[in-house]
Amino acid sequence: MRIMVMDGQGGGVGRSLLEALKERFPEAELIAVGTNATATANMMKSGVTSGATGENAVVYNSKRADVIMGPMGIVMADAMLGEITPTMATAVASGDAKLVLIPTVSYTHLRAHETLSDLV
């Protein structure tokens, strides 16, 4: 199984995912794909052997992955302070890979008793 973990910014979410995946699925091919060099470098510290950076790396590896994991923003154009390009978001969201999207603090700031309609 080929699992692509994608992250941007500092790559902390991706690194945590890769560390857990490496322990849980040692036979899986894990690929770290960052939107920037810092994110990729941090994810590579998890001990994976394959990593790539940038828009073309996202497009190329999205087509070949069985599973794509990362923060929710990887399927939203202009997310992560603009690091996710429309091309990246489309490549991740429209492929055949199963998606595992992790909600992050910026997407989970609602209090327990609030709903989205309370904010609108």
Language model segments and positions:
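Short glycine-rich anion-binding loops that position phosphate/pyrophosphate groups of nucleotides
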Residues: 9-11, 73-77, 81, 105-107
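Mobile beta-alpha loop/short-helix "lid" or hinge segments that flank ligand
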Residues: 97-107
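N-terminal beta-loop-helix "entrance" segment that forms/cooperates
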Residues: 31-52
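Glycine-rich phosphate/diphosphate-binding loop of Rossmann-like nucleotide-binding domains
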Residues: 4-34
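Conserved small/polar residues in nucleotide/adenosyl-binding loops
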Residues: 108-115
